[in-house]
Curated annotation (Swiss-Prot):
CDD domains: delta_endotoxin_C. Belongs to the delta endotoxin family. It comes from Bacillus thuringiensis. It holds the Pfam family Endotoxin_N. One of its GO terms (biological process) is sporulation resulting in formation of a cellular spore. Promotes colloidosmotic lysis by binding to the midgut epithelial cells of many lepidopteran larvae. Active on Plutella xylostella and on Bombyx mori. Toxic segment of the protein is located in the N-terminus. This is Pesticidal crystal protein Cry1Id. GO terms for molecular function: signaling receptor binding; toxin activity. It comes from the Bacteria. Keywords: Sporulation, Toxin, Virulence. PANTHER family: ENDOTOXIN_N DOMAIN-CONTAINING PROTEIN-RELATED, PESTICIDAL CRYSTAL PROTEIN N-TERMINAL DOMAIN-CONTAINING PROTEIN.
Length: 719
């Protein structure tokens, strides 16, 4: 191997203290010897040889790209945006050349080592082709109608094609949920389910213009609501089933386990987290959603391409157990934080003056929540005479890492380490991009280049990666054993912003995990899979947390608050801004003790009293009160809704109340008017059905009771 910048390396080496655990490997027992192997052959992983990514970049980029595109089109988009979204998805999922659906299948088959049966594969691919062809026809008709909205024939065509296509999705979805093959087909199911829900949304957006009746629009809307629950629970259940099947005991099993966790999050769970935001009655204007989950790229360690040297691969080199690795690199549920500084401590692995490796041996991370205090964590060895390297990342997004996995060989004992990392970053608020690097020196070793963008590619390829990156570095873990030091990077999605900015012209969703503190009694727990990240829990009364928010003017803008929560008990939610009480209200239990935390356990509710912010930066506080110890209350997120958005809901409530009152001869509701018929009562019932559960759930229940009473009176009168 050629050494790079030999003089620089020697200057590092001359000041370095040799770590005995690395320079005397033969003192340690090992069962992995390279029998009859040639030392040079073992190290023949040419300088900067790139590790073959487990899957093509385009496969994961499809999942990332579709989720990213949808994140920019939540709420009720313009007609042109809807057509553009379909055009994008058609190009991603039904491109020319090899079927993207086949690539999805092959990827998961490889991950879980399970082949899809020939019949199930062929049936799914045939149905997918039919759906793609039908979607393309509908998309073409939709574009024609957008350009000719007053053309009766064009309107009739798109309406009929819509109804036929929606029914086709209902018929074909079961082909992607074949018994015994749910896990390998899961990305197919998730993408098809996503398209079905987007299609159902079109009835709410365009149905009235197409000539659909209010009853027909409500039917499509109700189907969208029920299918959102079904699809969310299905995807979460089979994701967890597949992940648990891969749980093993050794380091090699952890590699596949982590790959499945990461890739299925990108291809399945990220989409599922967006499903509720397709509800146009809840989100009738542009809406900002955020994904706060973390994903982990592959460990930075050499993987030898020659099976004869398998013992030099990091996970075969007396690496820690599955559970030890998981505990070392996967963080416990925590508030969302941002990396500000990394201090790296190096160790020296030396065989000779021409074969040595200064490598990452430990680190100290500094990070903070939004508006919170600085926190630190330390891993690995920090007691070294090699000068530590400190890299600042305050207000910078590290969007890409290029890491060298190094292999140094002492006779029969390999040593795996990381001798170089380039961190590519950009300032959050400025169009300036650069990089910081860790590079203490090495010579005569085998190296492989691992590029994070092979696993977490940008959302698009049409822009520079420092503009279109999809993830930012959030944390670094270290797998540590006597002869292995392997890094694992943790990443958060770019949509989880650093500022909690509330806009006056859109609905702002803020996951509560973005609070800056965690009061006594509150805890962060793993999300159920469909929330896009972790959630907060309390089992006794008190504050959940404080969120530092930034307000875009005008400050006179008023908002109403919504909460997405689950609870085993009736309770009160209290909210305040900068310590001043804003809202307080009673809310119902959503689940029973011992029940699963599934989709139906969560409910989004709202306060009716509006409020405004007086400062550009404020602290918003939410707490849960008036319930018995031992119950469970969870909050996923809060939502700030500009007041104008809820006027329609208020109008609908008043209209329903007036229609009910008009059926009776007096305000005491004892006698129906003579002209009230069954059909009239059914129409009023549909009006009540369309009321917002989020704002007027109790009023809706009360009005339904009156409608039932009216039906009973009408039956008695007819008799």
């Amino acid at each position: 191997m050629k050494s790079k910048n030999q003089n620089m390396y020697r200057s590092f080496s001359s000041n370095a203290t040799v770590d005995k655990s690395f320079t005397d490997p033969l003192e340690h027992n090992t069962n992995m010897e390279l029998q009859n192997s040639n030392h040079e052959d073992c190290l023949k992983m040419s300088e900067y040889e790139s590790v073959e990514p487990f899957v093509s970049v385009s496969t994961i980029q499809t999942g990332i790209g579709i989720a990213g595109k949808i994140l920019g089109n939540l709420g009720v988009p313009f007609a042109g945006q809807v057509a553009s979204l379909y055009s994008f998805i058609l190009g991603e999922l039904w491109p020319k050349g090899k079927s993207q659906w086949e690539i999805f299948m092959e990827h998961v088959e490889e991950l879980i080592n399970q082949k899809i049966s020939t019949y199930a594969r062929n049936k799914a691919l045939a149905d997918l082709k039919g759906l793609g062809d039908a979607l393309a026809v509908y998309h073409e008709s939709l574009e024609s109608w957008i350009e000719n909205r007053n053309n009766t024939r064009v309107r009739s065509v798109v309406k009929n094609q819509y109804i036929a296509l929606e029914l086709m999705f209902v018929q074909k979805l079961p082909s992607f949920a074949v018994s015994g093959e749910e896990v390998p087909l899961l990305p197919i199911y998730a993408q098809a389910a996503n398209l079905h829900l987007l299609l159902l949304r079109d009835a709410s957006i365009f149905g009235k213009e197409w000539g659909l009746s209010e009853s027909e629009i409500s039917t499509f809307y109700n189907r969208q609501s029920s299918q959102t629950q079904e699809y969310s629970d299905y995807c979460s259940e089979w994701y967890n089933t597949g992940l648990n099947r891969l749980r093993g005991t050794n380091a090699e099993s952890w590699v596949r386990y982590n790959q499945f966790r990461r890739d299925m999050t990108l291809m399945v769970l990220d989409l599922v987290a967006l499903f509720p935001s397709y509800d146009t009655r809840m989100y009738p204007i542009p809406t900002s959603a955020q994904l706060t989950r973390e994903v982990y790229t592959d460990a930075i360690g050499t993987v030898h391409p020659n099976a004869s040297f398998a013992s030099t691969t990091w996970y075969n080199n007396n690496a820690p157990s599955f559970s030890t690795i998981e505990a070392a690199v996967v963080r416990n549920p925590h508030l969302l934080d941002f990396l500000e500084q990394v201090t790296i401590y190096s160790l020296l692995s030396r065989w000779s003056n021409t074969q040595y490796m200064n490598m990452w041996g430990g680190h100290k991370l500094e990070f903070r929540t939004i508006g919170g205090t600085l926190n630190t964590s330390t891993q690995g060895s920090t007691n070294t005479s090699i000068n530590p390297v400190t890299l600042p990342f305050t207000s910078r997004d590290v969007y890409r890492t290029e890491s060298l996995a190094g292999l140094n060989l002492f006779l029969t004992q390999p040593v795996n380490g990381v001798p170089r990392v380039d961190f590519h970053w950009k300032f959050v608020t400025h169009p300036i991009a650069s990089d910081n690097f860790y590079y203490p020196g090495y010579a005569g070793i085998g190296t492989q280049l691992q590029d994070s963008e092979n696993e977490l590619p940008p959302e698009t390829t049409g822009q520079p990666n420092y503009e279109s990156y999809s993830h930012r570095l959030s944390h670094i873990g270290l797998i540590s054993a006597s002869h292995v030091k392997a890094l694992v990077y943790s990443w958060t999605h770019r949509s989880a912003d650093r500022t909690n900015t509330i806009n006056s012209d859109s609905i702002t969703q803020i996951p509560l995990v973005k609070a800056f503190n965690l009061p006594s009694g509150a805890s962060v727990v793993r999300g159920p899979g469909f929330t896009g990240g972790d959630i907060l829990q309390r089992t006794n009364t008190g504050t959940f947390g404080d969120i530092r928010v930034n307000i875009n003017p005008p400050f006179a803008q008023r908002y109403r608050l919504r909460i997405r929560y689950a609870s085993t008990t009736n309770l009160e939610f209290h909210t305040s801004i900068n310590g001043k009480a804003i809202n307080q209200g009673n809310f119902s239990a959503t689940m029973n003790r011992g029940e699963d935390l599934d989709y139906k356990a969560f409910r989004t509710v709202g306060f009716t009293t509006p409020f405004s912010f007086s400062n550009a930066q404020s602290t918003f506080t939410i707490g849960a009160w008036n319930f018995s110890l031992g119950n469970e209350v969870y909050i996923d997120r809060i939502e700030f809704v500009p007041v104008e958005v809820t006027y329609e809901a208020e109008y609908d409530l008043k209209k329903a109340q007036d229609e009910i009152t008009a059926m009776f001869t007096s305000t005491n509701l004892r006698r129906l008017k003579t002209n009230v018929t069954d059909c009239h009562i059914d129409q009023v019932s549909n009006l009540v059905e369309s009321l917002s559960d989020e704002f007027y759930l109790d009023e809706k229940r009360e009005l339904f009771e009156i409608v039932k009473y009216a039906k009973q009176l009408n039956i008695e009168r007819n008799m």
